[in-house]
């Protein structure tokens, strides 16, 4: 399995030693799952499946940021309890992922339940001299990590430009370095808080993922995944925390990042409101397999724009594939399956994999000539391969 590694900017081969270990950053559950989310989780589901199909056991961990500023702000705005909102949207997310046939993580871990882990990690960082206080908040000093910047490959100027757009506070008085990040936010009026050795408060965003990953996966796990908007500051900060807490051990071996999905000319995001929700499509009786196929038509690392036409093309494609699969016999399946597996092993190239299926369907239906039905078991073999490798369940009732 070769994946493009963000820090090295090249494809590297993942070589799991024992169970493959995967961490993908999860949602902040204050709204429904949109197609940008779905694209990321479908992509890393391909990795999970590829490892499993290659015979590896897989330990897959995903967090849910079930306490954070956006969640608290949304709960206040719509006049619901923040816990109720988080639980409702988390359950909807799980339903959406199940409909898209994303294999659930082995450990799906909330920030709130992980607060003891976060406190323990902050204590280790404090012992290492990497923590300081600004009023009631605790900050991580990025200079404590000699390798800071290696994960993103960004220079300081670019970091400072982007940091305030992604939750950072570079201009706060009292900070030692503008890029330092909060690891413990002291109690604010009207906000939930938990006791700690440094006073009541709640975790910072980055440190929760570090604590969860270290507890459930250990150090130097195989792949850290997420969207490209997490390269900096999130994954850079997570790596910094981990590498100061456990010197000499990298946080992850490979960092793999998916592209951004746009809609109406801009990145799909909750703040802009230009969202297409998986649940809304499902409630409109759209076949979830068509949604998944529409996502798979794009390479996961590419930025791309969603259009409704793509969905309807996928609906038609699924119908055409099912028609070919209903025949039983078809064009030889073995070379098609080999091509699908080879494509996915090459940086999760789902467009190449689905194109191989298109060619088999065309040959089987005789779209461009005589129908090829020389393989009597083609449909059964391809149905199983589509399910196992691409997560497309096209079994005929």
Swiss-Prot record:
Which superkingdom heads the taxonomic lineage of this protein's source? Answer: Bacteria
Motif 'ERGGDP' region residues?
A: 165-170
Does ATP-binding appear among the keywords?
yes
Keyword Transit peptide on entry: no
Write the Enzyme Commission number(s) for this entry.
Answer: 6.3.1.13
Motif 'KMSKS' region: where in chain: 267-271
Q: Where is this motif: 'HIGH' region?
A: 27-37
Instruction: Kindly list the GO CC terms recorded for this protein.
Output: cytosol
Keyword annotations of the record: ATP-binding, Ligase, Metal-binding, Nucleotide-binding, Zinc
Residues noted as binding Zn(2+) in the record, renumbered to the chain: 25, 209, 234
What does the note under cofactor report? Binds 1 zinc ion per subunit.
**Could you tell me which InterPro entries the record lists for this protein?**
Cys-tRNA/MSH_ligase (IPR024909), Mycothiol_ligase_MshC (IPR017812), Rossmann-like_a/b/a_fold (IPR014729), tRNA-synt_1_cat_dom (IPR032678)
Required co-factors: Zn(2+)
Show the SUPFAM superfamilies listed in the entry. Answer: Nucleotidylyl transferase
Listed binding positions for L-cysteinyl-5'-AMP are: 25-28, 40, 63-65, 205, 227-229, 261
BP GO annotations: cysteinyl-tRNA aminoacylation; mycothiol biosynthetic process
Enzyme class comes to ligase
Q: Which Pfam families match?
A: tRNA-synt_1e
Q: Which HAMAP family match?
A: MshC (MF_01697)
Instruction: Report the family membership.
Output: Belongs to the class-I aminoacyl-tRNA synthetase family. MshC subfamily.
Entry function: Catalyzes the ATP-dependent condensation of GlcN-Ins and L-cysteine to form L-Cys-GlcN-Ins.
What protein does this entry describe? L-cysteine:1D-myo-inositol 2-amino-2-deoxy-alpha-D-glucopyranoside ligase
**Which species?**
Nocardioides sp. (strain ATCC BAA-499 / JS614)
